[in-house]
Each structure stands twice: as structure tokens, then as C-alpha cells.
């Protein structure tokens, strides 16, 4: 993929978690005939990004991402929490003007929503731009490069929300459908989503 340049964002797909509440690799779980991970990749409008990087502990997911043309990084210490995934991906795309941080367990997230987040950030490049529904923030979130040092300083299972809480004045919300922001942290959550599909 291309090198990052002015107002060109990278996209980091965070797919390295242990899914302890799910009981197994939840990203292999099926929804509407596809794995959660495949649906996450399908929601990425790759043309909007200078680079897409997938961080995972699972070789099969890294292989799928590589076949899709995306960069991959093995997280060999997922027990260190989401902060390690954030750090690995952020350092790999440190030359980008911003990075969209995307979880991989939102099967109803639409590529159009991701496009609108990137468009809004390009109009307001100093803002943290996040998907939201009726004012309630969700994922994904796009952070300008000025926040990379704080993101790289995160520890254990602390994610980008702790950075956002310190910079609420810089937050720009982009409206999304409520169901798009629903993440499948448990098998029960996935079954609920299937029942409402």
C-alpha cells in the first residue's frame, strides 16, 4: 500500500484479543454466512486509506488479511492486553496523519460509515473522530497523529477511550446506525444480534 501523506489516514484492525468472555476465537464465529473477521475486512473502504494493517495473534486471520492485500503484524503477547495491539499498529503507521482504530467484532458496521468518519476527519484533522449513535460514542475512532504518543503509552487492557476522556474537547462524533455499533463480546450477544437481523 501507499506511503502515508498529508491528510492520509491508516486503518488499524485490532484482531488480537483473547475473547475470554466469548470462550474461543470469536472472530471465527459466523454471522450471516461469514466470519466476524471477514465481515470486518469487508467494511473497510481500502481506497480511503494509505495503508491498512491487521494486528492479530491468529495466523489464519493474518493470512486472510494478507490475501486481501493488507499489511499484517503478529501480536505474540496478546495477554498484554489491547494496549500492545494499539502500540504495534500505531508504530507501524507512525508516518500517517491519523489512524482509524477498528475492532473486528462489529458485523453490521458499514463501509459507508467508515467513509463518513474519514471524510469528517479530513475536514477537521485535529479532531478525534468517532462513530456514535444519538450522542453515544462507539467504534471505530480515528485519532490524529498528535495523539499517537499517548496511544503508545497505554498499558494493559486500557484502550483509546482513556485518551478520549482526556480530550473530550477534541471529539467529533459521526452518526451511525445503532446496530452498526453493536459488538459481539459474548456468544449470547452474537445470538441476540442474529435474532434481530
Region spans (language model):
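Short, glycine-/small-residue-rich phosphate/pyrophosphate-handling segment
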Residues: 137, 141-167
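Nucleotide and nucleotide-moiety/phosphate-recognizing core
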Residues: 3-137, 169-177
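Conserved alpha/beta core of the MobA/IspD/sugar-nucleotide pyrophosphorylase nucleotidyltransferase superfamily
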Residues: 2-7, 155-197
